[in-house]
């Protein structure tokens, strides 16, 4: 296909990304050329897993040098439902394969580098054209058999059985497989022969979920390259199942599963090759293995030492192969690859899992750096981690290291992060100590320099991917197993720049989560090989200058002991020490050797590894291996507290530091930028003081920081690392403080979190660095935090932590959160303070600020600043201004430059004794107490000043502490921080979810929860700087989300300063954030300075969980997509918000909008008009009165705002408040919309609204606005106690200002001044009070009335920073402003004149209103003024009105009728204009709705109308106005009355007909007869003239008697009629009642009587 040199600009990532239908993989044909000298000393891991002698055949080395730059593109064709098969036509491949086998044999003999070299030769010698075909048909049995040659069938685990399975029994023993040369024939699960790939072992072959196959590792890559020309390839054995299958099901359970098993990852459906080891992997391990993806180390130049390339490749391949028997555990996926079982103990197969499922594998090939952008289809690409796997050939130990690296890589894959695997030959264990090999590696590591560009790209995606990977089921990030025999394996180191002197390959495992899946244990074996599998948290260490992590791990005889420590992910043949158990014995022996071995260069790279990967190593490191890279990894894994171990690499590090310091810084910076949050947890306990090697040799305080995932401290250190001062300078003090804090945290944090990791933040600067990454990691000991140098302590805490980290899903990612770059450590420190502020804000940040401002707080701040520098806590509260502390810290930082950092960290940790830790904790407690007091006393202005000063101080201190190189790092970090800050999508975007949970599990939670003192903010900062959102959500301080209410962003920020601070990594962004926070705080505290904090706290408590869920936070602003509701014209539209140019410009694509046109909005608009889309989970979650919006119909895209109401049922014409709608329909909620409509809405069509969202007025006709307002007011008022209106204060159980109004009115109270005022207030509101209300609403209504709506929620919102303008605006929108005034007056002092019930309600309302108003005296005073004004205006109105009308109206209103409102609404009635005002009818009584009526047409019905003293009720008869017919008025029976949505009062009338209007009616004796008819009409209520009576004839006759004179004037002054019968005007059918007398009957009767009398007389 195509080969290119790493030097070429083209990158593998580009190539990979470019592929679509066919995926092209760049397979490095050879390792980078390296100086043969470098290779000679290193022991190398045979690709088969065997350990080979450090020396490699010269030819191999030479070949390596030649072929180091060539890459092979492998094209994979994808066909539906088929798995890729890679075929290549290369005679070269066969030769290579044979050569590889030969080399493997040689390696068996002790030349591990030979195989590596051979593979690299093959790769380089020929361009491999590999086509991967996906074929539906399964390979024939015969072909398979031929291809496998009785080798372990790799595809046996596939869902569909293949003939290969028959071969399985033959290869039951892992030993058999590795030993068999036929393994060359072995087919991949993918049907790709390792030989085809040109690699003897599959260690370098990576299969991406996309069906892409990649080879990695120098020699391995070469072997994989396609050396199998002579091998018969069988058709692809892939299964054809398109659907994803759980990995566990795929994994073979057979005891003798030497081959790799083909499995699909359930989540992504990607194909994963899992090594089938003699020991079955735990399901979680298998899952981890499946998830793990290691970037081919071949991409990284790997020829530092003779055989170094092969060692590196082998290490990379074997990194997943913990046991020396790499052959049993195929170097990579293909067990056959590992041919020498005899040489190595059977490694766990989990480690063989080098295939990383990645939807897309993007590789950037550069001479020194390979970046694999593992973009998983299912997981967001945003979380990309760079896995640097430096495999150093160093005998057996290298194998262990390789396994460690591989495990790290698998962990990385879990994070779906990019991994750079640097395969570098390492000298044998003795060589480890020697600097020269490391130097060779340095040359070979130009890659770190290349990394910087990659970092930016990766930075954004790493976190997310890492998080996604973290989700993988396996607690151990990597399935790799580390054999105990690997104990001697050199610790993996992160190489940030080619400068790394240590030859040991370092695998940067970004994705390693707390489980410490990497084989840091192997890392501690630096003596054997410096290859350190470090889980580097790209996010946390932005500054390359923190290489100190690469603490040198002296290679002691005990290096081999390192295997004891094992990662959760690592299965070791030898008993694995429990997580809590430290490997002091093994670690200790290693310490000296490891310490000597790691070069400063490694230390710097280790900074990159700042995440916990070193932790795994660190347990080993515990014996002072403190390899810089190991330590950082361990620090992340263990607790990222092993920074001190970094100093361990004294002589070697010191030497290397000079060489690699600059390069490492660059690499670190790049890695930091990449900052993938991967925080492996080390399960091995390390003894705290074991790796006593003083970090002094290394001046890399920054490295220490990196080792400590907690960023806050690392940035500080990074700034200073350049200067090399006494190793312990101020570090001892800081460490002591940090340790003390850790102890304190452990106690508190353990209670907060199940895991002891809560201590994490407190460790020394190392701890600080680790805290962010390892807060969850720190678990076992408070002292361990300082002791990354003390490997054992960390391991124990790490192991405890490991569980928490992995348990959160991949909380290790949290460690990654620590991603805040070391360069940005200073900046992040500031964010930490901010977080602190946020925390304090949730618990009193304002007072905290004041405290900080105060001298006391300054002193405390000084302590905390020292902590910040040396411990993750980096308390914001601490004032760094203290001159002594600053000078001490500066000295310490300068003393600890990259080379000294590790030693420094170790020394500090060692120095840190329990007493110091206790002292630190004491100081912290005192500081917190004082700070709280100060907070209470402090005022808003003071708080502002304090916050500004604090920010400035922090920045100044950070700058002072930071050395110029650090500052250089800091600039990118600042940029990153700005990105990561409120505007930083990387951190906010990636870690909001995982991070929060992880942090909660960590000590972060404890800090914020218990106090806002320095420890919590620093820990948050460190862990959150990159994944800021995570810490926010995870820790209590985070718990106060940076929910931004509409146009209340300031308030939200003020509420959750922690989040903001977390997001801001850089000092510049910190300043901006600080100023913003100040402004927000100002707004929030406008009402009152002294009581502001209390008020805010109360408001927060009142703030419903719904409001918090709905508010946008800074984290949401950086997510790729966020479901939101945006307010447009009073209606809400659901859509997806995406950042265009965060943090300023965003786009919202509304659902169902034509063409998916996006609306571009500014940050301000987003925060003001947008809320998160939250659907209620159940009807119970929508209590009556809840503000919500709902889809009226599926056909409409908009959601109408409204509120939940009680479902009402009409019973006998009366409205009764029925049980909540939930009782009748579980999934329906009765909703009253702001436009007056109501209905029962299905739960799925409802979305939550902020409780203080104002009632929008929908006035189709402005002329009806008055009536509309009244109508809504009436509706709300008459809804009864059960009803809830937004405008009144919250009453327990129901909030309805109108409810008390209607209740009060219902009583027969005498007219009172209050009633009069209410009446006139209502009438004059639009006129004179309108302006005054607008002016005063800000002060009064904004607080009190608006608050009434939420029952204090508004007040809380105001206290939280809702602007007065917003409150005023909201209040102005309320339809029931009149009621508001009335309500306020009632609350004032006139309640006594109201009914008892009313008093109760108003009293409750008053309490609700005055609770906030008492907190804000200004609001109270303003309200009083408004009331006074209202009274004055009412008096004026009184003069305008006639006394009679006024009194009648007042009396009516006192009785409870809302006539006044209806009089005001006369404009809504057409006839009203022709009637005197006092003759207008108004509703009387409570409105009701008929059950069963749905939709907008649902009306508010009333039983009664009233005018003055007259009342007419449904069922009554009335005379209607008519012209020209005084003798025959229109008379009808009132059937029903209601108010329309436009405010009109309508009456339905069943008309009566006069006899004159009928046809065929006989002459009736008595006038006043009426006939019922089916004729009904709807008329305006105002057409009713007056009430009349329509009686049965008997009653009528009894009333008037037989006197005919009475009947003559009946039409003149009598409104009594009788019902004579029924008439149908349409049919003209009349039915006369039987008892109705007619004139005809009378005549007949008279005649009969006369005749009778005459007869009698006769």
From Swiss-Prot:
TM annotation in the entry: none
Pfam families for the chain: BAH (PF01426), BAHCC1-like_Tudor (PF21744), SH3_TNRC18 (PF24912)
Broad class of where this protein is predominantly found: nucleus
InterPro entries for the chain: BAH_dom, BAH_domain_protein, BAH_sf, BAHCC1-like_Tudor, TNRC18_BAHCC1-like_SH3, Tudor_WGE
Regions of compositional bias (Polar residues) in chain numbering: 612-637, 650-662, 1411-1423
Distribution of this protein across tissues and organs: Ubiquitously expressed throughout the larval and pupal developmental stages in larval tissues and imaginal disks.
Composition bias type Low complexity, residue spans: 106-122, 948-973, 1020-1040, 1057-1070, 1346-1361
Subcellular location: Nucleus; Chromosome
MF term (GO), any: chromatin binding
Domain spans labelled BAH: 1510-1634
Modified residues (Phosphothreonine): 546
PANTHER family linked: PHD FINGER TRANSCRIPTION FACTOR, PROTEIN WINGED EYE
Annotated region (Disordered), positions in chain: 85-122, 575-662, 829-878, 927-976, 1007-1042, 1057-1096, 1270-1308, 1323-1425
Residue spans of biased composition, Basic residues class: 832-841, 850-865, 1325-1337, 1369-1386
Keyword Transport attributed: no
Protein name (record): Protein winged eye
The keyword Protein biosynthesis appears for this protein: no
Biological role: Functions in the determination of disk-specific identity, downstream of Hox genes. Overexpression induces ectopic wings with antero-posterior and dorso-ventral axes in the eye field. Overexpression is sufficient for ectopic expression of vg in eye disks.
Written domain comment of the UniProt record: The BAH domain is required for localization to specific sites on polytene chromosomes.
Keywords assigned: Chromosome, Developmental protein, Differentiation, Nucleus, Phosphoprotein
Protein's GO biological process: cell differentiation; imaginal disc morphogenesis; positive regulation of heterochromatin formation; regulation of gene expression; transposable element silencing by heterochromatin formation
One GO cellular component term noted in the UniProt record for this chain: histone locus body
